[in-house]
Structures are given as structure tokens and as C-alpha cells.
């Protein structure tokens, strides 16, 4: 009986060991590695996190397709990799904190995102691809031309953005009443319905908004903050993808593709 029990126990140990080895193999990193050494979370796709809507950088067209400046540039990267771009709409907080990249939700983030020291601590940024300026949107005819004019008035800002951070610097000094909104659409609506007197966001965003809402609004002031946008990847997690993004950007700027995309979505590119 003891012998049979020992045999059974030995067999059980072998079976458990085999299962453990099998499980170990199954847990192996299942992300696809391209010939170029680029790791992708999903085979055959470049998965990109963004936060919608943020036109002209990313938003849905009438047919529900996500389009925009960032989208077309990342399409170039996907083409270089020989894959298709897949876009995931996710809260901006998860993007700017690096969480979405760290958890493997996406390979890269493209969300009209300013490169900052704080964000560089949690993700790796590409070379800058866009120079950004903050701007103040008001209803046409309103008397506000600067932050000074908004003392004791409500100023709308978008959560987790550099526009919000810029406004916070002057909140006490200029007596601003900041009202924070989760996304751009809510911020725009707040200006339209008078919930706030004005709103701060990136100039290209307001320029696009004015195109779609002619006559009702105007950019009252611009603030040159020296900001630059960058695409991002997991911190120290995918150097080959970062390299491919930078190579694609450089190539697009050299062959005129970048200028064509810029003119399509933003307007004529300023002289360097």
C-alpha cells in the first residue's frame, strides 16, 4: 500500500511540475516582437491610447472614425512597422500618469500631450512634434482680453492639462475662480451656456472650435508657454518603438509628409 501510495504521490509531483512548467510557458510575455525589435501588446497592431475629443489632434468624424493630426502621424509609424493602428479612447489621467502604458493597455500614447518634467518621470517621450500655445476663449463681444480682466470671474479649465496648470499659477494673484471640467466637450459647452466667462486650452483646439462655430466665439488672448507635444511609450519599456517613432517623424519632416498633415489639420506651418 505504501509503495502504491508513493507511486501515486510521485506521479502527482510529476503532473504538478508539468503543469507548473506549462503555466510558466503560458505566462511568457505574449506581446509580439517585430523584426525591428519593437514590442507590441497586440500582434499585427500598433495600439495607441488617446482621449476624445481633442480636435484637431483626435476626434471622431461623422462616420465615427477617429481622425486628426496625431492620428495621421501615428498612422505613418504603424505603416513603417507594417501593422495597422488601433486607437483606444481612455481618460486622460491614465495617459498622463503613465498607467495605461505601464499596464499594457497600449503601446504608445498620442493625445496632444505636452512634454513636462513630471510626465517624463513616468514615461518616455518622442522628439517634440508640435509647438503649442495656450489661449483664452470667450463669447464674441465679451470684454475679457486678459486674465486680469477675469478677477472674481469663473474661468474654465480642462482636468489634467497644462492649460489648467497655467491658470493655477495665476489663480490667487489675479483672483480667478477656476472651474474644472473632465473633457474638452464639457469645457466648450460651459463657455457656450455661460457657466464660465472664459476658458483656457491649447490655441489649435480653439482655432478648430472657431471654424465649426463661426461668429459666436473668439480667442481673446494667447499665452506663449513654450510648450511642445510629444508621443510617449512605457518608461524604459520599449526603446525600439520610441526609436521608430523618432525616425518616422524625422523622415516625415524631411520628405514633406509632415507639412502636408500639418496644413490639412492646423493650417500653414510657421517658418522654423
Label each PLM-derived region with a short phrase:
Residues 20-24:
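C-terminal motif of bacterial Sec signal peptides marking the signal peptidase cleavage site
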Residues 27-36, 84, 164-179, 217-220, ...:
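Ligand-binding clefts/hinges and TM-proximal coupling segments of bilobed small-molecule sensing domains
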Residues 32-111:
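Extracytoplasmic small-molecule ligand-binding "clamshell" domains
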Residues 52, 130-138, 203, 207, ...:
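Periplasmic-binding protein-like
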Residues 52-55, 66-80, 113, 132-185, ...:
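Bilobed "Venus flytrap"/periplasmic-binding protein-like clamshell domains
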Residues 71-80, 161-162, 231-270:
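Extended ligand-binding regions for polar small-molecule ligands
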Residues 79, 84-149, 218:
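Acidic, polar ligand-binding/catalytic clefts
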Residues 112-121, 168-169, 192, 197-225:
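A ligand-binding cleft/hinge motif common to bilobed small-molecule-binding domains
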Amino acid at each position: 500500500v505504501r509503495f502504491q501510495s508513493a507511486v501515486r504521490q510521485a506521479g502527482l509531483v510529476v503532473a504538478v511540475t508539468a503543469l507548473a512548467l506549462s503555466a510558466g510557458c503560458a505566462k511568457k510575455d505574449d506581446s509580439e516582437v517585430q523584426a525591428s525589435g519593437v514590442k507590441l501588446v497586440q500582434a499585427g497592431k500598433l495600439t495607441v491610447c488617446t482621449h476624445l475629443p481633442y480636435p484637431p489632434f483626435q476626434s471622431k468624424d461623422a462616420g465615427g472614425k477617429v481622425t486628426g493630426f496625431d492620428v495621421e502621424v501615428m498612422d505613418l509609424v504603424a505603416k513603417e512597422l507594417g501593422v495597422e493602428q488601433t486607437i483606444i479612447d481612455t481618460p486622460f489621467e491614465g495617459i498622463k500618469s503613465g498607467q495605461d502604458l505601464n499596464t499594457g493597455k497600449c503601446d504608445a500614447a498620442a493625445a496632444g500631450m505636452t512634454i513636462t518634467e513630471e510626465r517624463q518621470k513616468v514615461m518616455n517621450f518622442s522628439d517634440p512634434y508640435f509647438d503649442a500655445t495656450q489661449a483664452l476663449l470667450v463669447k464674441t463681444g465679451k470684454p475679457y482680453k486678459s486674465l486680469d480682466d477675469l478677477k472674481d470671474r469663473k474661468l474654465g479649465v480642462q482636468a489634467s492639462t497644462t492649460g489648467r496648470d497655467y491658470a493655477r499659477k495665476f489663480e490667487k494673484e489675479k483672483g480667478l475662480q477656476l472651474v474644472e471640467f473632465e473633457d474638452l466637450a464639457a469645457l466648450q459647452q460651459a463657455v457656450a451656456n455661460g457657466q464660465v466667462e472664459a476658458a483656457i486650452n491649447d490655441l489649435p483646439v480653439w482655432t478648430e472650435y472657431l471654424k465649426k462655430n463661426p461668429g459666436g466665439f473668439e480667442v481673446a488672448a494667447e499665452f506663449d508657454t513654450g510648450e511642445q507635444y510629444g508621443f510617449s511609450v512605457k518608461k524604459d519599456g520599449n526603446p525600439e518603438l520610441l526609436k521608430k517613432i523618432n525616425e518616422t517623424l524625422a523622415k516625415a519632416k524631411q520628405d514633406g509628409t509632415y507639412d502636408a498633415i500639418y496644413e490639412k489639420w492646423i493650417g500653414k506651418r510657421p517658418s522654423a
